């Protein structure tokens, strides 16, 4: 039996790039392993951090009697926030720390992220953050399930006033301290690059550095970028501080004593129950991106109505499969306030994933004309990310971004010039990347044709309305006014000179966020919100307080931080707060 790739693969390309027999390639919009080429060498299993490779061989499990362990603090989750929290807490207190990670390997979603450290004006991870998303591209269309498909405008930042301002301020300040702490680490200093920024020499860990996965040419996803570098750096500190890491060990319940304070954790590994007596818990267990029950409850439009819109492309989930919202059960088990009203998701698109970075970048440019399979535009392409929600309402939830040759060449030339660094180098090979996509014969990702008629036929786009839409779009480009969706004139590029390109796109998410509500010190509130649970802390995607529920399909996720920033800044702040508690 040959190896197979499981459906939750993130599409990071690492296994395909490292496969010695080139057995891994696209079939449709998913990576698959060719059984005729696979020699079952195990290289893909070795490099996959989320255990997405099914070897077909049953795992041997040795049942054991309940284990009894003891620690001062248990950290739940060995991703970015959890590993930062564990190391900082151990450094501050010298206490015994146990880290629980339910996956086979540490890292979580942060393993695939970027991350920057700097002592200069570029700022560090604690730099002021805003809602994630691309540039303002002008107003969106009507949007929402009632009004039909449209592109939502970027959110008014007044939503920040609804959030916990003291928590936001504390987390940002903690981010500055985290940045300074990392700059002084001996394990970090050899990787800092000295550059000139605004006339000043600064040391930075930049996205120009790829620490492993060197064959990658995709700037949109790790591993090997700053996110995995930070996590690896933290885990290398574990032996120094005596931190115990238990993988394949999922926390199931947080215990409290008669006063309501944390007293322990019940967990399970493949062999049985693990009971840990402790005084404190820091929860950094990730989002609920792979919990379909919670998604259906809070974000039902994440899933298509198969009767109304069959054979849809699923939303691509840029999140570890272990992101299943464990904090909900854990929080309820100990009487914490689970802030369901703030549950939200970040959707963006269209994205070209898991295909080439060149295609991904082309769709980020905003210069394309994007159509559904009926050949019609449906949103303002200049508002990067705003296409995600209206894609919900498009046939099969898939779209194509259309370029002519001068338009595509201009986008790539501009990207090479402005992106710089390693992403600029990736874009220099855009023609090679596109040819490799065409040669893969996946039947969906990219089509190139000499005429628009041929392009429509190849991509499965309804020809007559498509040709009418291109003519209408070109007319608006000449006028310099997008009469349909308000696209900025600078992004209005006519589709006139072949060969023509049709670049596949779909919806994606990097997380569904929310969980237990925390106070300005990352302490978790009790269910009555009249106080906190002594010894319980949370940070990152599973902690509420820095995000607001957008409200309806099509609205943007509203958050005061980027995801990775809230994870590591919050993890650092949690460690500082927990240290105060343990020293009492």
What residue spans do the PLM features occupy?
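Glycine-rich loop(s) and the adjacent beta-strand/alpha-helix scaffold that form part
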Residues: 269-272, 276-350, 554-560, 564-568, ...
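Conserved redox-cofactor binding core of oxidoreductases
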Residues: 175-272, 292-293, 349-351, 477-496
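Beta1/beta-strand and adjacent pyrophosphate-binding region of the FAD-binding site
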Residues: 65-81, 98
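Glycine-rich active-site loop/strand segments that organize a redox cofactor
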Residues: 116-183, 193
């Amino acid at each position: 039996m040959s190896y197979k790739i499981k459906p939750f693969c993130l599409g990071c390309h690492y296994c395909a790039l490292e496969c010695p027999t080139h057995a891994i390639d696209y079939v449709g919009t998913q990576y698959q392993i060719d059984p005729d080429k696979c020699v079952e060498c195990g290289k893909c299993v070795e490099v996959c951090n989320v255990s997405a490779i099914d070897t077909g061989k049953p795992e041997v499990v040795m049942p054991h009697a309940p284990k009894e362990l003891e620690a001062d603090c248990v950290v739940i989750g060995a991703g970015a926030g959890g590993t930062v929290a564990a190391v900082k807490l151990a450094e501050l207190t010298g206490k015994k720390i146990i880290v629980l990670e339910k996956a086979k390997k540490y890292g979580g979603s942060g393993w695939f992220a970027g991350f920057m450290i700097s002592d200069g004006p570029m700022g560090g991870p604690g730099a002021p953050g805003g809602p994630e998303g691309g540039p303002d591209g002008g107003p969106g269309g009507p949007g929402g399930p009632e009004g039909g498909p449209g592109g939502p405008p970027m959110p008014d930042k007044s939503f920040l006033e609804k959030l916990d301002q003291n928590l936001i301020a504390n987390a940002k300040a903690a981010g500055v301290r985290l940045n300074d702490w990392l700059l002084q680490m001996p394990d970090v200093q050899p990787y800092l690059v000295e550059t000139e920024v605004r006339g000043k020499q600064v040391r930075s860990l930049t996205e120009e550095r790829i620490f492993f996965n060197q064959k990658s040419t995709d700037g949109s996803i790790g591993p090997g970028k700053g996110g995995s570098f930070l996590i690896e750096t933290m885990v290398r500190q574990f032996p120094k501080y005596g931190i115990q890491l238990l993988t394949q060990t999922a926390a199931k319940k947080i215990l409290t004593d008669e006063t309501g304070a944390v007293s322990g954790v019940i967990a399970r590994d493949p062999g049985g129950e693990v009971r840990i007596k402790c005084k404190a818990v820091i929860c950094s267990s990730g989002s609920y991106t792979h919990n379909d029950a919670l998604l259906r409850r809070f974000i039902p439009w994440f899933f298509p109505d198969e009767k109304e819109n069959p054979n849809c492309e699923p939303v691509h989930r840029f999140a570890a499969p272990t992101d299943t919202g464990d904090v909900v059960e854990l929080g309820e088990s100990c009487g914490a306030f689970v802030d369901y009203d703030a549950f939200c998701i970040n959707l963006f698109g269209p994205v070209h994933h898991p295909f080439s970075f060149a295609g991904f970048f082309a769709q980020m440019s905003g210069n394309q004309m994007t159509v559904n399979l009926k050949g019609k535009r449906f949103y303002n392409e200049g508002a990067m990310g705003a296409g995600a929600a209206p894609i919900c309402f498009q046939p099969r939830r898939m779209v194509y971004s259309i370029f002519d040759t001068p338009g595509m060449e201009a986008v790539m030339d501009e990207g090479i010039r402005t992106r710089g660094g390693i992403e600029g180098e990736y874009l220099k090979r855009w023609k090679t990347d596109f040819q490799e996509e065409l040669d893969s014969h996946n039947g969906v990702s990219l089509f190139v044709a000499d005429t628009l008629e041929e392009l429509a036929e190849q991509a499965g786009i309804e020809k007559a309305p498509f040709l009418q839409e291109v003519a209408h779009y070109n007319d608006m480009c000449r006028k310099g006014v997008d009469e349909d969706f308000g696209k900025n004139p600078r992004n209005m590029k006519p589709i006139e000179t072949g060969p023509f390109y049709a670049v596949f796109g779909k919806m994606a998410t990097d997380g569904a966020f929310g969980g237990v509500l925390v106070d300005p010190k990352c302490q978790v509130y009790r269910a009555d919100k009249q106080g906190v649970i002594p010894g319980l802390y949370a940070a990152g995607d599973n902690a509420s307080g820095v995000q607001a529920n957008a409200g309806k399909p099509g609205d943007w996720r509203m958050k005061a931080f980027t995801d990775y920033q809230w994870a590591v800044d919050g993890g650092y702040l949690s460690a500082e707060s927990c240290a105060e508690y343990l020293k009492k």
